[in-house]
C-alpha cells in the first residue's frame, strides 16, 4: 500500500480574487481522491480538515499517522467521518469491525488505535471517502445508514433543484466534537444544489461529488458573493470551501454529493444566505 498526502494553505479572500483558473484548481480542487491500493489525503489549513480517500483492491490499507499530525496514531487527537461510495467493504477500528455498504457512513471518535480499510470483493472495490477534524475528546464509534439520517426534502423539479439532504453524521444523530457530514441526492432532472447560496463564517466545508456519469461534469461555484468563481469537476472529485466562500453547483446531469463541515459550532442552520440576484 501507499499513502499520499499534501498540505494546502489557506487563502485570504482578497488574494483569491486574483487567482486564475490554474491557481484556483491547484488550491481548492482535489482531483485524485481514489487510487487503487492507496490512501490519498489533503491536509487543509481551513480548520485543519483532512479530506481523503482509500480504495483497497488487493491489499488491506492502513490509516497512517501522516507527519503533519505529529501523533502516534491518525486518530490520537482527531475524529473522522467515512462514507463508502463503492462496493461493500470493511473498516476495522481497533478490535471493532464495521461492514459498510454503498452510501453507508461511519463515525470514528478520537483515540489511539489502528484503522484499516478492506474490500469484500476485489472485482468491486470499496471506496472510502473521509473527512477528519481535530477533536478535544472521544465520542463512541458508530455506523450510520440513511435510515438513521435526518432527511430534509428540498427544492422542486420546476426549480431544477429537487433533492434529499441526508444529515447523517450530525449532532441530531450522534455526538461529535466539530465534524458534521451528510449526503445530498439530486432527483433526475434536477442539477442545482445550495441555491440560493450561503456562507457560514463559523465553519469551512468540503464537497465530494459522485454518481456523475463519465460523459458529464459538475460546475462548482465558489468565492465571495460579489466575486464568484467556478471549478469544473468530474465524478469522484472533491473541493475545499473556505469559510468566506459560497459553495454551490450546477451540472449537466443529476448527481450526489457528500458535504463535510468543521469549525466553530455544530449548528447546521447557522447560514448567511444571499439573494440569487446579488450574485456576481
Swiss-Prot record:
Listed pathway(s): Glycan metabolism; pectin degradation; 2-dehydro-3-deoxy-D-gluconate from pectin: step 4/5
Cofactor note: Binds 1 zinc ion per subunit.
Catalyzed reactions per annotation: 5-dehydro-4-deoxy-D-glucuronate = 3-deoxy-D-glycero-2,5-hexodiulosonate
Keywords: Isomerase, Metal-binding, Zinc
Required cofactor names: Zn(2+)
Residues the record lists as binding Zn(2+): 198, 200, 205, 247
EC number: 5.3.1.17
GO biological process: D-galacturonate catabolic process; D-glucuronate catabolic process; pectin catabolic process
Transmembrane segments: none
Domain of life the protein comes from: Bacteria
Entry annotated with the keyword Isomerase: yes
UniProt cross-references to Pfam families, sorted A to Z: KduI
CDD domains, sorted: cupin_KduI_C, cupin_KduI_N
GO molecular function, one term: 4-deoxy-L-threo-5-hexosulose-uronate ketol-isomerase activity
Keyword Manganese: no
Function of the molecule: Catalyzes the isomerization of 5-dehydro-4-deoxy-D-glucuronate to 3-deoxy-D-glycero-2,5-hexodiulosonate.
UniProt family annotation: Belongs to the KduI family.
Name this protein carries in UniProt: 4-deoxy-L-threo-5-hexosulose-uronate ketol-isomerase
Organism: Bacteroides fragilis (strain YCH46)
Taxonomic lineage from the root: Bacteria, Pseudomonadati, Bacteroidota, Bacteroidia, Bacteroidales
